[in-house]
Regions:
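Primarily single-stranded nucleic-acid-binding OB-fold modules
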Residues: 1-176
C-alpha cells in the first residue's frame, strides 16, 4: 500500500527484535497505527517525527492486540523525494518566453546519493510545452530537456518553475 499522512503519537520501544517505532499516520480521512523497525528508524530518523508529512510504502497486517489493522512500514519518503520517486517529469508551459533553465537547475540541482551501484542523481527531467492556437489551426510541441536539466523537486524549486511558466502552468506528470 502507498499512503500519505501526518506522523503523530510517535514512540520508540524496545521490542523482541530491537527498537520499534510505533506511531499514527493521519490523512484526515482515517488514522492508522504504523510500525517501523530499527533499520527503518535509523535510515529515516529525520522523517519519523511528530507532525511530519510522510509518504510510505507499507504492508497492512492484522494487529493481535487491538483486533484491527496495523501498517508495517517498508519505505518512507518526504514529499520532494516522493515527487522524485514517482514523478516522470515536470511539464512547463512556455509560450513565447523561455524560463531561465540554467539558473533554475543551478539553484535546485538534483541530489546526489551513494548507493551500492554507485552514485545516483535524484531529480526530475523537464519538458517544455509550447502551444499555439489560431482561428482554424492549433499546434503543440513538447521538448524534453537533457539530463543536465534535471532538478530536485522541492517546494521552492516548483515555485520557481511555476513563476517562470506561461500563466503559472507547470505540473509534475506521474503517469504517461
Amino acid at each position: 500500500q502507498l499512503l500519505a499522512g501526518i506522523v503523530s503519537d510517535l514512540r520508540i520501544i524496545n521490542g523482541q527484535r530491537g527498537k520499534l517505532a510505533i506511531f499514527k499516520l493521519d490523512d484526515k480521512s482515517a488514522v492508522m497505527e504504523a510500525t517501523a523497525d530499527e533499520a527503518m528508524i535509523n535510515a529515516n530518523r529525520h522523517l519519523l517525527k511528530d507532525d511530519e508529512l510522510v509518504i510510505v510504502m507499507a504492508k497492512m497486517q492484522a494487529d493481535r492486540f487491538s483486533g484491527g489493522y496495523r501498517l508495517s512500514i517498508q519505505q518512507v519518503w518526504d514529499l520532494p523525494s516522493a515527487r522524485c520517486r514517482f514523478g516522470k517529469f515536470l511539464r512547463v508551459y512556455v509560450n513565447g518566453r523561455a524560463p531561465e533553465v540554467a539558473r533554475l537547475v543551478k539553484d535546485f540541482p538534483p541530489q546526489r546519493e551513494m548507493t551500492e551501484q554507485g552514485e545516483l542523481l535524484r531529480g526530475l527531467p523537464v519538458r517544455l510545452k509550447l502551444e499555439r492556437r489560431g482561428d482554424k489551426v492549433a499546434a503543440a510541441a513538447e521538448l524534453l530537456l537533457g539530463e543536465q536539466a534535471k532538478f530536485f523537486p522541492s517546494d521552492a524549486a516548483l515555485s520557481s518553475w511555476i513563476a517562470q511558466a506561461d500563466q503559472g502552468k507547470a505540473e509534475i506528470v506521474y503517469e504517461i
